[in-house]
Amino acid sequence: TDADRPINYNEYGAYTQLTKKLMDDRLKFTGSIRYDKSKNFEGNYSPRVSLVYSGGESRKHNFRGSFQTGFRNPSTQDQYIGFNVGSAILLGSAPDNLTRYKETLPVSVGFGQAFAGGATTNITGEIAYNNSYTAASVGAFSATGNAALLKKTNLAFVKPEEVKAIELGYRSFIQGMSVDVNGYYNVYNNFIGNLNVVAPLYGKAQDAPAQPSPIGANFADLGVRSVYAIAKG
């Protein structure tokens, strides 16, 4: 959404690490932490600790374990895209992107223009977030004509993806053969994905409206918005 004005966006970070050897250098401890700050998100700390122990007379048996956290900030596209692809509008979900995206769209002749007050209407990204229905509920309404099936969307702004990771491993060289065994366990939160919503060009979106007509006569004035939001699992 940089057609009218540039997108000012900044990130910065800092990293430090400490290494200490113990037990006649058989045990190696490494601890590190990284701090990252992005304009649209709270700062993130990413700590990591690891231990490596070398056993045996020749120290050929190496056992290791580590714990760390990490994150991935949403890309600039996740946050600031605003692109009409015809069948949908791809919309990034940075808070200020909702007002950056603006477009004028035609309204159907007859009921639509009478309700909207003209042949066109101006939309912004705020419509997708604050005045839209879930695509699944609109599909159910389309199939049955039952407005009680319509569900208003409840969207959260995109957040950084997060991961917590544990790793255990063993490595050695035994009788001319290299042995390397690793195990991982990761827990992810806040996966980023697309979520389709359907926004009326006029009228107020609400759960189970008594009259379906405000969402657009014969679906002529419904628009699909493909929104970047947190994927719910």
Q: Where do the protein language model's features map onto the residues?
A:
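Outer-membrane beta-barrel translocator/channel fold
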Residues: G56-V158, E162
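Structural signature of outer-membrane beta-barrel domains
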Residues: T1, E11, D36-N40, Q68-P74, ...
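Structural signature of outer-membrane beta-barrel channels/translocons
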Residues: T19-M23, V52-G56, E161, R171-Q175
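Outer membrane beta-barrel strand-and-loop segments of large Gram-negative receptors
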Residues: I7, Y15, A147-E161, A165, ...
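Surface-exposed extracellular loop regions of Gram-negative outer-membrane beta-barrel proteins
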Residues: R5-V52
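Outer-envelope beta-barrel architecture signal
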Residues: D25-F29, Y45, R59-F63, Q175-V179
